[in-house]
Amino acid sequence: IDSETANVETMTNEVVDINNEAADNEGNVSGISDNEVIESEVKDNEIISNETVVKEIKAKEAAVPDRKKAEGKDYIFPPVTLLIKEQQTQSSGYEQYLKETALKLQQTLESFGVNVTITDISCGPSVTRYEMFPEQGTKVSKILSLTDDIKLNLAASDIRIEAPIPGKAAIGIEIPNKHNQTVHFRDLIESSTFEKFKSRLAFAVGKDIGGKTVVTDLAKMPHLLIAGATGSGKSVCINTLIMSILYKASPEEVKLIMVDPKMVELSIYNGIPHLLIPVVTDPKKASGALNWAVAEMTNRYKKFTETGVRNIEGYNKKVKELQKSGEIDPETIKKMPQIVIIIDELADLMMVAPGEVEDAIVRLSQLARAAGIHLVIATQRPSVNVITGLIKANVPSRIAFSVSSGVDSRTIIDMNGAEKLLGKGDMLFYPAGYSKPVRVQGAFISDSEISDVVEFLKENEDVAVYDTEVTEKIENKLNSAAISQEKDEYFEAAARFVIEKDKASIGMIQRMFKVGFNRAARIVDQLADAGIVGPEEGTKPRKVLMSSEQLEAYFEEYL
């Protein structure tokens, strides 16, 4: 009986609990059916679950910043949170150190009979510039001749004297900082200079001596040459250029062609939507890609002529107007994207196919600007046989990183100075239109940051769509080049001649056909490749390996 009584009490308590849960705000429970109680419980659960979902969504949105969408496009710009941010401050006694150095500099110059007044101190990320005004009658050349003495008295690793500073009545002496500050790429991307920059080809270069953000327009450069010794910061500079474009332009606006004979620097970008074709690592294919760009440039100019415009901006504006008015179908005639061709190591290409590569680069650099095609060329061997006079004359904008000698510096920027740079992104930035190069500390971006951005783009783009037409043209060019190693016009006659004489030598071919040594040597090599004559045997004539009948059979089959 006791257990039954306990069960009844438990059931009564449960009913009271249910009624309490179903009660309205005033505590009234009368007139509520069982079904209504159940429905109200379900609705309460729904409200709780919805609130939970909303909270989760808000938490995720707080973790990942707004992903800006390109106007009318599906491209989602990568968030800046994928990049590293680091607060860096100078030590408390640094201002005092700068004043002491300025005083020491002034005293050093006075000891050599040069009186100067320090007018300004500009502290940059890696270098501090002391601006000074010499007294009347002091020759600038005298200050320049004291470079080594200043270096000795200040115990500086290296100094650079800019005399005079462009636009100022002052001389600048640049001295390396005790502690260098890293310029992170995110600092440049988040700066108002970059955000307000209108061009789709904005390039966040770095920070100048005054600590100002330097952003330039690749479209106005219009081609760029980057050179410097190994490990000076060229590849990082190329990465900052590519990442600047990824943060500024959609794939419909800018397309990239990357040539990377080193195979390791740019391959990480395979799969991003901006790539026109996969990263080219074969130097032979690279010349094909450049030749395709020349053909594309010619094709674009034909379209400009047909539509009566002068450049890519005019063409795209006209297409937009015609699309709005409904005169043309947006699917059949589209806007032209700007194309940036990035070559990471020119020296490798110049070794494989110097003639073709140089011709293509010169043609593109002379004519491609208005067609919206821009070249970025990097090399670690700034010698005259890599950066030829023709290439230099047609690529007006330059970036010089640290090099070993003044000769290399003059090859890149036509003046000394790059040999005094510190390395690790320290550069002389010399775009078209500047009277003198500007010293800039290049931005740093790590491999992990690049990987994160590339992965983000791949996730949001599903599958990278490459232009198969371009790839096929490059492959066809390569295959036709391999097949069309055409035989010399004297090949048949020479083959019959050597079989008749039963021996073959370059001298025999020269005398018989009245050709030069090089051509005769090529004919003999072709005969050897065809299996008609044997290999070289020192100074002896080559052996003939075919009979007349075999030769005729060979001609029938292959020629």
Name these PLM-found stretches.
Residues 1-223:
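Low-complexity, intrinsically disordered P/S/T-rich segments
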Residues 67-87, 119-127, 217, 225, ...:
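Flexible hinge/switch segments at interdomain interfaces of large molecular machines
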Residues 137, 169, 174-202, 209, ...:
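P-loop NTPase motor-domain active sites and their immediate coupling elements
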Residues 163, 228, 277, 511:
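The Walker A (P-loop) glycine that initiates the GxxxxGKT/S ATP-binding motif of P-loop NTPases
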Residues 219, 246-284, 288-289, 390:
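P-loop NTPase switch/communication element
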Residues 220, 230-231:
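Walker A (P-loop) phosphate-binding loop of P-loop NTPases
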Residues 234:
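Conserved lysine of the Walker
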Residues 237, 241:
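Hydrophobic positions on the alpha1 helix immediately C-terminal to the Walker A/P-loop
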